[in-house]
Amino acid sequence: ERMLKRISFQTAYSLGENLAATCLDLAWHKISEEEVPSPYMAGAFEKEELHNIGLLNTQIPPRYSTSYFNHVWGGGYAAGYYSYLWTEVLAVNIADYFAKHGALDPAVGQAFRDKILSRGNTKDQMEMFTDFTGMEKPDASGFLKARGL
């Protein structure tokens, strides 16, 4: 039981780090050019944003601080760090769909191929998700369960 609690704590802490990084990434991209703080005030901006969302931990510095968090600044990932967690939520929901409807059923596999895989980036991802699962939006509870929370 103690071991399971420890695993849950580590998982929750890791998710907190990812959520903090996601929110920090989005915070930098939602402000106007005039609101961008000077480089000397970037740390204060970061602390204020993390405090406002309840993810500021004064004892442990953030894993992804603004000064070295490359996803914030470019490489095709700007304001996109959230996509790591979001795709995990979608993947868990799709896995649940397979589990409920027969993971080895050829018709289910063909529907997945036709409604998601063959579409690539030609259709909105949420439309493809809804077309396949019948769900208007993903359920986060499966994601949390998969994370042991």
What do the PLM-derived regions correspond to, one by one?
Residues 1-149:
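Cation-handling catalytic/transport regions enriched in His/Asp/Glu
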